Amino acid sequence: MDSNTVSSFQDILMRMSKMQLGSSSEDLNGMITQFDSLKLYRDSLGEAVMRMGDLHSLQSRNGKWREQLSQKFEEIRWLIEEVRHRLKITENSFEQITFMQALQLLLEVEQEIRTFSFQLI
């Protein structure tokens, strides 16, 4: 994973954690948790690709890795929709910028996970 993506994740997570969205703060905390989980999953897939011979290890450690991959893509789609919704309803420019960057990062991560998974298949 390149250092720009790492800093982007850290920056967006930090900024999202500072937002006060009133009654939707639980939803935002859920988004932050899923974002962080997605980052860890993407990192582990990337490491498996780097070791290429690790496919058998990945499969034995998690016999349902394709199912897990499918679940991660569903989480990404949900996060993308949630971020788009937040963009539509917020009028705060700080929040708009944060959610725009989060959306861009999600699209990049989706593409990276897709690339990693094709290399592992």
From Swiss-Prot:
Subunit structure: Interacts with protein M1. May interact with host nucleoporin RAB/HRB and exportin XPO1/CRM1.
Role according to the record: Mediates the nuclear export of encapsidated genomic RNAs (ribonucleoproteins, RNPs). Acts as an adapter between viral RNPs complexes and the nuclear export machinery of the cell. Possesses no intrinsic RNA-binding activity, but includes a C-terminal M1-binding domain. This domain is believed to allow recognition of RNPs bound to the protein M1.
Species in which this protein is naturally found: Influenza A virus (strain A/Pintail/Alberta/268/1978 H6N2)
Main location group: virion
Record-linked InterPro entries: Flu_NS2
Gene that encodes it: NS
The protein, known as: Nuclear export protein
GO cellular component, one term: virion component
Family to which the UniProt record says this protein belongs: Belongs to the influenza viruses NEP family.
